[in-house]
Amino acid sequence: MGLRVNVSAIFMAVLLTLQTPTGQIHWGNLSKIGVVGIGSASYKVMTRSSHQSLVIKLMPNTTLLNNCTRVEIAEYRRLLRTVLEPIRDALNAMTQNIRPVQIVASSRRHKRFAGVVLAGAALGVATAAQITAGIALHQSMLNSQAIDNLRASLETTNQAIEAIRQTGQEMILAVQGVQDYINNELIPSMNQLSCDLIGQKLGLKLLRYYTEILSLFGPSLRDPISAEISIQALSYVLGGDINKVLEKLGYSGGDLLGILESRGIKARITHVDTESYFIVLSIAYPTLSEIKGVIVHRLEGVSYNIGSQEWYTTVPKYVATQGYLISNFDESSCTFMPEGTVCSQNALYPMSPLLQECLRGSTKSCARTLVSGSFGNRFILSQGNLIANCASILCKCYTTGTIINQDPDKILTHIAADHCPVVEVNGVTIQVGSRRYPDAVYLHRIDLGPPISLERLDVGTSLGSAIAKLEDAKELLESSDQILRSMKGLSSTSIVYILIAVCLGGLIGIPALICCCRGRCNKRENKLVCQDQA
């Protein structure tokens, strides 16, 4: 009974082994052709953004300094108008041509909001991005009553950062970049400084703040509707304390660093007030969703030598795995951090079956190309071992002072502590660890993939050759088509007669040929007999 159980257990173990995939990426085989993985991370995608209003109060509260700063405040207002008025006019041109659409319900005779419509004829020319941003602008802008309440609240506040809660609406955060300087520096020193000096100090501070405003909103002058402002740029106007602003906005995401590095938090202008000098921004900050099971791998390649030629394996810089699937990975919209990979959109797209076979360990499926010019990597440290192309660079054992040679039948050299604890390669001294890779990769023990060319001239030449061959094949196909068309012109009875004639000719010709051959053979035999008798 025990033997039967053991046999059953062994059978199940073997069955599970056969059904279990051997793994997504075969790092062992890839290392033989100079490809190693230098990092893996989780995959996160930004999802739908949440919105919060932020007010930048450009004019500080100078009630206690009015007698000393009137000239500076007047000049500062003039400068602000040069920035704010073009933005206000562009916003008004868009919002005045967007109106709500209402429908009348059939059951109850009342109107219900259905959406907004853009008056394209009145607007004239607008890009798709501007139209989309204009609709979003209409949806996020405040109504006139809210603007009046906000203006009244801003005129009375003298805080650098203050939360203003509108009636029946969400909280609005108001920020003034110069107010702290006025409250903490100028007002306490009014008794020690002259009025002129206080005015000069405030004037310099306002001028500096104006340059920051201009650098932040200057690009918006060209396209105020669709221009977006990153939270990093916004932090300069907010006094540099970005954490305090995000905390006031209610953002408590655990992936704040990733969103900041990927510039996922954006701000867009929704209102400009040239009476009280403030700007209303709609800030969109997304949340991150981790795609479970997806791992992003970074690949790095090392060149290797075949005789006197230097090659390297052509593989993507980043790939992604999910279960047994391997996908290409577009890193253009992503930010890489130790905690994971953050992307603003889906970065996965299908990979060719041949490249998947290559990454799964079939080295003969991995394309290779000749090294031309300066190549980045001729050595790399992986798992504490040094993988080096010692045929192209100088490898030296620093411990013993001897040169590490690479035989012609080797394409790469793997150096570990059992061979040389401290290695000097290309002028860099590296201490290596215990062996994780074989000593060397021999050419006769590995199947290399097809050579390809990535140079523009070589690719053009190869394409020209391929086109010429296609033209030759096209001519042959055309000639064969002509033969087929001529065959189509023959009737079926003609084809039958031709076949009968060929068969009759064969029946008559073959016996005649046999008779001729026999006659010649008989003549040769008679000649030989006569010569023997003579």
Swiss-Prot record:
Transmembrane residue ranges: 488-518
Spans annotated as HRB: 445-494
Glycosylation: residue positions: 29, 61, 67
Interaction with hemagglutinin, as annotated region: 367-444
UniProt topological domain (Extracellular) ranges: 24-487
GO BP term (any one): symbiont entry into host cell
Name of this protein: Fusion glycoprotein F0
Source organism per UniProt: Measles virus (strain Yamagata-1)
